[in-house]
Amino acid sequence: MRESWQNNSAWDGAQEEAMRFFTKKRNAPRYEAGELFFCREAQGRQIADRISEMIKSPYEKEGGAVRFQCQGVEFSFAAFGIEDEGEARIYARQELSGVKGYLRNLETAHGNVKRHLLYTIEQCGSVVRVHYSFSRKSERADREKILLAENRMNEILKELRGVRTKGGSALAGPDGRMILDDNGNSKVKNYLPLLEERSQEEGPEEKAFLKEALARRKKSVMQLRRRQIYTPLSLPVIETEREADRRAKHQICGRAAALLTVSLYSECLLGEGMTPSEAGAFVRDIAGRFRAEEFFSPSEKAYLRDGCPDYRTQIQFSWQYENLYVMEWALGLFERLDWPENICSVEECAAKIREFCSLEEFERSVSLRPERELLDAADLYYRLHWACRDAAANGYPLPEKVLPEAAAERRRGLFWAAGCRTAPGETPGGTLEGDGWDQTDLTI
C-alpha cells in the first residue's frame, strides 16, 4: 500500500527510508513499528499540543514532535501540517496527495466506503508519523505490548478525529477496524466521515431566522447519512420560509400541464417511433385541455416546434416526468416522494392529471403543500444532487441506490416550486415566460 501511494505523489527519492519506517523489526532485541495518522489540523504544533494534553505520563515536546513512555513502550509522534513551513509542509502535502491518489485508483466493491474515505482524506491537513518500540521478552509479553501500543494509538487517534495506516497495508479508524486494504477489502459495513464540529455560518452573531435554515440543513445531512451518503455541513443553506417565494397553485398546475405535454411528446418520439408531426398531433388534445401553451418555457416551445429534434434533446425532455412527479407531489396527488433509486412511475404520473377534464377542474381539486414541506424536500434534494455531482466530478464512486438524473431533475422541480434562487429579474407571481422555469438555478 505504502509503495502504491508513493507512486501517486511527488516523492523526493527517500522511498527506502519510508519503507523502513513501516517495517516491523521482529527479530531484533527491540521490537519497532510505525504507522501514519491523517488528521484535520493543518499545523504540526497543533497536533503536538493536542497529543501532549492527552498524555498523563511525563513527555518531551519540541515543535511538532512528542515523545513519551507508557508501560515499557516508547512512543514518538512527529506531526507535519500543510500550513507548516519548509520541508514539513512539503512532506504533509505529498503524503496527503499520495494517499488520495492511491485511493482513487484502488479497485474495490465497497464504493460507498471508498468515496467516504476519500472525503475523509480531503478534510485532513496533517500527517503524523507514529513510531513505537519496546524491549523484547517473550512472545506473550510482546503481544501484550503490541496490543497496548495499538490501543494507545487508537485512543489518541479518536481525539484527533483522524484515520491511520494499519500495518502499512490498510487504512483504519480509531476503533482499529480496517476501512480498506490494498486489495479493496473492508471490515466495516458502513463508513462515513465525521461531521464537522462547526459549520461556517454558525456563531453567536447568527440571525434568528437563519436558525430555521441551519436546522433544515442539519436534518437533511442526517437523513442522507442514514442512507450512507455524506454531504458536508459547510454547504450553503437554502432560503427560509420568510425568504422563499413559493409558486402559486395556479402556476404549479400549469407547470404540471406543460411537463406532461413535453414528456408525452418525448415518449412518442422515443418509445413509439412517431415523427415530430405525429407526436405533436398526439399531445395536442392534452395541451389544449390543460392550456399548456400558456405555461411552456422558451426551451419547451423550441423543442415542440423543432421539426427534427436530436436524440440527446429527446432524452433530456423525457426526464421531465421526474419534474411532473414533483409537481403532483407538491399538489398532494402523491402522499410522498419515493427515494430516487429508480425513475418515477411514468404511467401513474400521466394518469393523475388526465383524470381531470380541464385546468380549472385540476386546480380546484388539489391542495398545495405548505412552504415548509417544499423547502424540506428542496434542501434534501439539493444536498443529494451535490453528492452525485461532486462524486462524478472527482471520479469517485457514485452514491449507491441513487439515480443521479432523477435526483437532479427533482431538485430542479423542488427549487422552482418552493421559490428557491428565483430567476434574475423575476418578481413575485412570475413575470418571465414559463414563470422562469428555464432560469432555475441548479448551481451547487
Where are these regions (language model features)?
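Short amphipathic alpha-helical segments and their helix-coil junctions
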Residues: 236-243, 289-313, 384-401
